């Protein structure tokens, strides 16, 4: 066996969709998992005693949030270089993600990591610097491009990836998308949570509300257009259970996302050559957690009617379609060619 063959055999490929709210991972050995993009630290000595370790990552940290200092290292889908502390939090998350993929001691770890479509060069460089500490080779690519690659939709397609921190929109034209082919909006899932919390409190000021409750309402009832059911949810008021109809607040919050998304789709549609635009309209694909919004495809199709008859679809697996595309890219394209696609660290 040659040295090259030995290296290939010991390579572990990872597709990582690093999100503001959740991180999804798939490996070339069949490992597949989702965790909250959160790190928890004890608030005081009592918290340290309860936790029994210096920090905890993911869903476990979120469940212990009553006595932990909860940190989300990703803001609007990118790492924020505010202080050494912020960088340390991000490092703890990334280290945990790679460790959870269960690499062997002699593995060469090669990871493709998704970032928002218009992430800055500084943010990409910071992520790659951190990745270099835990993997041998890392490539950062735009999240909607990862989705398109996984779906074999790389030409005459517009991908709209609605995450928690950002909505990323990408025009795929048969080449690696450039900045002019992509849009990043900061109105996404977290924005809906905030709008929904405010809209509910405007109508029901007696309810005890926070963004976690608003998120639970959104995940159960989110819709745009005409409602198909009453959004009746059990809240708390003065500590007692109270059921309230929040159908209208849910509609208002979810539809608040739509104008910027529609405008961005229209702008990117016009960037295609005119002879391809009718074909592009047949390939509008929504991905990410926001693609679960009921009535989304029909709503967007109607808004795009002035441009022609559109075919709008939502991916079947919004949780893992991004990292699945990243893993497929990692496996199909040898790491020595990754620099042709984007920013790379390592070999």
Curated annotation (Swiss-Prot):
Gene label: mamK
SUPFAM superfamilies attached to this UniProt entry: Actin-like ATPase domain (SSF53067)
Positions that bind Mg(2+): 143
Top enzyme category: hydrolase
Membrane topology qualifier: Peripheral membrane protein
GO molecular function: ATP binding; ATP hydrolysis activity; GTP binding; metal ion binding
Residues noted as binding ATP in the record, renumbered to the chain: 9, 20-21, 76, 164-166, 218-222, 289
Phenotype when changing residue 143 to A: Wild-type subcellular location, MamK filaments no longer dynamic. Protein polymerizes rapidly in vitro, has lost ATPase activity, filaments no longer disassemble. Only partially restores magnetosome distribution
Family affiliation: Belongs to the FtsA/MreB family. MamK subfamily.
Domain remark in the UniProt entry: Domains close around the active site upon filament formation, which probably enhances nucleotide hydrolysis. Nucleotide-binding also probably induces domain movement.
Activity control mechanisms: Filament turnover is promoted by MamJ and/or LimJ which have overlapping function; at least one other protein is required for turnover. MamK filament dynamics are probably required for the assembly or maintenance of the magnetosome chain.
GO terms under cellular component: cytoplasm; cytoskeleton; magnetosome membrane
Protein name: Actin-like protein MamK
